[in-house]
A protein has these predicted regions:
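Mixed-charge, glycine-accented linear interaction segment located at domain edges/termini
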Residues: 93-114
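Terminal targeting/leader modules
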Residues: 1-91, 116, 121-141
C-alpha cells in the first residue's frame, strides 16, 4: 500500500496504469508549494513498485515524499532517491531522514511516516471489495 500526493510529482507518468484505491482532495492553505493536495492511495505489488521507483524518484519534487509499505517493509521516495527501511525499526530510517533534510523535507514528516491506513482509506477499500455485488444487496455489509 502506498500514498502519493499528486502535487509532489513533476509529472504523473510514473503512476500510469496504477489506479488509486482511495482518493481525497485536501485544502492546505499554508503550504507554499501547493494549497490543494490530491492524496491518492495505491495498492500495488512489489514487482510493479520496484520497477517504477527510479521514475518516481526522478519525478518527485523537492520538499515532498511518497511512501509505500507491506508488512514491515517501508519504502520512502524523495526527490532523486528512494530508500528501503524496516517500519518497526526507526534506526533504519536515519538514511532517508538525513537525505530528506537535504531536499527540504521537514523532519516532522520523515520522522512520523505512518504504516497505518487512515480510516477513510480503510472505508474506501471496504466499499471497493471485489466480492461486493451491489450496495443495494441486503447480504452485503
Amino acid at each position: 500500500m502506498g500514498c502519493v500526493i499528486l502535487e509532489s510529482l513533476e509529472h504523473l507518468e510514473p503512476l500510469a496504469g496504477w489506479k488509486p484505491v482511495a482518493e481525497r482532495v485536501a485544502e492546505m492553505p499554508d503550504d507554499p508549494d501547493a494549497t490543494v493536495w490530491h492524496v491518492c492511495w495505491y495498492q500495488v505489488d512489489e514487482a510493479s513498485l520496484r520497477e517504477r521507483l527510479p521514475a518516481l524518484a526522478r519525478a518527485m519534487r523537492p520538499h515532498w515524499y511518497a511512501h509505500f509499505w507491506a508488512d514491515d517493509d517501508l519504502c520512502v521516495v524523495l526527490a532523486g532517491r528512494f530508500f528501503w527501511a524496516r517500519a518497526s525499526d526507526r534506526s533504519t530510517w536515519q538514511e532517508f531522514i538525513a537525505y530528506g533534510d537535504s531536499v527540504g523535507v521537514e523532519r516532522r514528516w520523515t520522522e512520523n511516516i505512518s504504516t497505518q491506513l487512515p480510516a477513510w482509506v480503510e472505508a474506501a477499500l471496504r466499499r471497493s471489495a471485489p466480492w461486493r455485488r451491489s450496495p443495494l444487496d441486503p447480504h452485503v455489509t
